[in-house]
Amino acid sequence: MDLLRRVAVVAVLLSLPSRGRSGGGGSDLHPVVLVPGYGSNRLYARLTAAYEPAAPRCGAREGKDEWFQLWPIDAAASEPAQAPCLAEKMSLVYDPVADDYRNVAGVVTRVPSFASTRALVGWDPLVRQLEAMGHRDGGSLFAAPYDFRYAVAPRGHPSAVGERYFARLTRLIERASRLNGGRPAVVVAHSFGCALTYQFLRARPLAWRQRFVKHAVLLAAALGGFAEGMDGLASGAGSGLPNLAPPARARLARSQQSALWRLPTPMVFGDRPVVVTKNSTYSANNITEFLDAIGFTEGVQPYVTRVLPMWRALPAPMVPVTSMYGVGVRTPETFVYGEAGFEGTPEVVYGDGDGNMNIVSLMAAEEWSGVEGQILKVVRLPGVSHVGFFSDLALKKVVAEIQKAVSSIEVHRKEKIFSFLNNFEFTIPVPLGW
């Protein structure tokens, strides 16, 4: 009789409507929040009277109180005559006394259209696919762009811009859940957005994560930095301003807080040689020596106190994670500088990865597979480059994984039901759709 009563209770539970389902046949999809990579954010700026340009032409907009697009750069701004002006406006200043980063004096910046997918650059193919699934911008589909020049810092160190972004992201995820019947959100991040998302999740209380985040889909999550991060600080490569002189490119790269987050971490890279010169070999274990060698001594303090502590270890985020990344693409692994030292062009030794991120870093999240309570799925995409996630082949696989994550199968409700029955062995007919 006791068994029959339990079966009857299960039948009643399975017949109940979904707790978060909207009336009138509304969508059962969980909301999706997109966190873009470094280059997929828009950045606007305006100049105030406090701006003192290095060259008069750079202050042409000064005092006009008009916003202009700082990033992505347009063709005119990238030309040789204008590139130094753009670099000046995009630079940050690290204040060692305040222990934080800020804009150059007189430059005010903002990230437009927060919460809307209109803010994203290059994500249209994925957005269209998600809309075809039933998502709508501002309804169950949101975006969390950010000022890619900044990052966050460990506890005890201020990070005004990064902390403000995390606060906005918290409110956005809570709002997305509220607008969708209390269903937790699926966070989809790419590249640098994965690093931010990971640190964001680790900074939220576990109860909050379990309540508001159903799943994190991480695309090209290089959670251990990458080799190009060191070369970028040495030469300024990857600044997006090819017409800027190399020394100015390097100064721009070194000014940005996020550049230090790109450096290979000791935990993931260990003693692997990343930069080799005539007299020295630099790995993730002697980054401070590398920073001194390239003349970036002012970067040592923020690296040691604000970056290294955040990446000494990779504790599991304790939310379900799908990690997707490309493999089998030639990826810079070691940069060998010749007689000219850091003034010259390095010879590049290649290894496996996605063309930008090294395989050892892309695989870093896989250590979570042995953590009790951490759900992890890894999807490797042969031949897919770092920026190739929105190509036709990769996009289909990305959408398929997101679709699995957002579908509102009541996993937690069923887990409770079967926990209720865990002392019995019998078969219950399960309706299609489970």
Curated annotation (Swiss-Prot):
Q: Which UniProt keywords apply?
A: Acyltransferase, Transferase
Residues of the active site: S191, D354, H386
Q: Name one GO biological process term.
A: lipid metabolic process
What would be an example GO MF term here?
A: O-acyltransferase activity
Instruction: Specify whether Ribonucleoprotein is a keyword of the entry.
Output: no
Task: State the InterPro entries in the record.
Answer: AB_hydrolase_fold, LACT/PDAT_acylTrfase
Q: Which domain of life is it from?
A: Eukaryota
Give the Enzyme Commission number.
2.3.1.-
Which PANTHER family does the record cross-reference, listed alphabetically?
LECITHIN-CHOLESTEROL ACYLTRANSFERASE-RELATED (PTHR11440)
**Which family is this protein grouped under?**
Belongs to the AB hydrolase superfamily. Lipase family.
Which protein, by its recorded name, is this? Lecithin-cholesterol acyltransferase-like 1
Q: Which organism is it from?
A: Oryza sativa subsp. japonica
